[in-house]
C-alpha cells in the first residue's frame, strides 16, 4: 500500500546561513548605520534573538529575517515571533523560536482534516509525524494538496513516499 509521512522539519544549516545573510545586510543598510542591532542564532534552543534600539527597528529586522529565510527555502511560518518585546536599557529584543516537529494537537487536527475529507486513506500519528496510507496514489496526492491548503500555522513537508 502506498504511504507517505507528513513532517515539519527545518534545516538548521540553512537557518544559520539565513542569519549570517541577514547580519550581512544589516551592516550594509544605511538606516541601521550607527545603530546597535543584531541577530543571534541559538541552535540548541532553536531560537533567533533579534535586537535593536527601537521597537520599529526590531519589526524591520523581523521582516529582513523572514525574507532571508524564504530565500534559503524555509517557510516564514516556521518562525514564531511573540507579540511582546523585551525592553532592557536602551535595547528592544525579541526571541523568535523556530517551529519544528508536529505537536500532538496539530497532528490531531491533520488526522481530523483527512478523515473529514472522506478520502479512502488512513492517517496515524507517529511521534512528531503523521503517516498516511491508502490504496490509490491519487488519494495520497489529494491529501498532500489538502494539508498544503490548510492553515495550520506551520509549514509541512512530505517525506518517505512509498509505492
Curated annotation (Swiss-Prot):
It holds the Pfam family DUF520. One of its GO terms (cellular component) is cytosol. It comes from the Bacteria. The keyword Chloroplast does not apply. GO terms for molecular function: nucleotide binding. Keywords: Nucleotide-binding. Gene3D superfamilies: 3.30.70.860, YajQ-like, domain 2 (3.30.70.990). InterPro entries: DUF520 (IPR007551), UPF0234-like_C (IPR035571), UPF0234_N (IPR035570), YajQ-like_sf (IPR036183). Belongs to the YajQ family. Nucleotide-binding protein. This is Nucleotide-binding protein plu3881. The lineage of its organism: Bacteria, Pseudomonadati, Pseudomonadota, Gammaproteobacteria, Enterobacterales.
